[in-house]
Amino acid sequence: MPNPDNRSDNAEKLQEMVQNTVDNFNEAKETAELSNEKDRAAIEAKNQRRLESIDSLKSEIKDES
């Protein structure tokens, strides 16, 4: 029997995902300051993707509210 589709806490879960992504972004930014040029470029690219994810997650939160 499939599990019921309970979405009552989706906004809360999405907000937690946003906070985790922001935390990871900030930690990576600190790491980038101490990294070589190649690693710094990779970190900056990943952080750009994180910013895009944060925007998408915030949009989903609005949809859930």
From Swiss-Prot:
Keywords, ordered alphabetically: Sporulation
Main subcellular location: other
What is the induction note for this entry?
A: Expressed only in the forespore compartment of sporulating cells.
Q: Name one GO biological process term.
A: sporulation resulting in formation of a cellular spore
Q: Where in the cell is it found?
A: Spore core
> Which Pfam families does the entry mention?
Tlp
Give the protein family: Belongs to the Tlp family.
Q: What NCBIfam families does the record point to?
A: SASP_tlp (TIGR03090)
Protein name per its UniProtKB record:
Small, acid-soluble spore protein Tlp
Lineage here is: Bacteria, Bacillati, Bacillota, Bacilli, Bacillales
